[in-house]
Amino acid sequence: ADITANNNREWFLAHKEEYTACRASFEEGITKLITVISQFDPTIAHLTVKDCTYRFNRDTRFSPDKSPYKNHLGAYICMNGRKSLCGGYYIHIEKGHTLVAIGAYFLPTNILTACRNEIMGNIDEWRSRVENKAFVETFGTPNASKWGDENPKGFGLECLKTCPKDFPRDYEHMNYLKMKDYCAWIKVPDTFFEG
């Protein structure tokens, strides 16, 4: 049995030792990952595991789903920690739905507009990064797909249906401006972080 089938306080308290051991192992792995990533991205070298990991309890105040706990463990590794709007590295560990992601999502309008302007101003460099063979084979093309069993990889979680406000409607590479996030992800085996 796991938290997905038993998402209630009584079950959780009866299995708290298992959670504590699992959480400790997860945090140890994230600490190692920070060390590895900091070798090619020194902006995150100062982070601690607490800067990056999310709480296991859910905020249910405005949700119709009152399940008290998340079904996964997650960490966002970026220069300003898990609450940052900067791009970074996301780790999501959930039975049958483990994945790794890069980029940024849930961006406020002003930052999303700045990203779109930056892409337009540097479209050749942008395309050389997101249209190269290795990137496309790993993550795909902009597709606004939710992660799940049917989507083992993706580039972009949400896209606008039309041109964003104040951008030219006839822009040749509109698919990049319609993106509401710049997040690329790939599903990995649940055992990916073991060992």
Predicted segment positions?
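Hydrophobic/aromatic-rich structural module bridging two neighboring secondary-structure elements via a short loop
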Residues: 38-88
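Charged, low-complexity intrinsically disordered regions
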Residues: 87-195
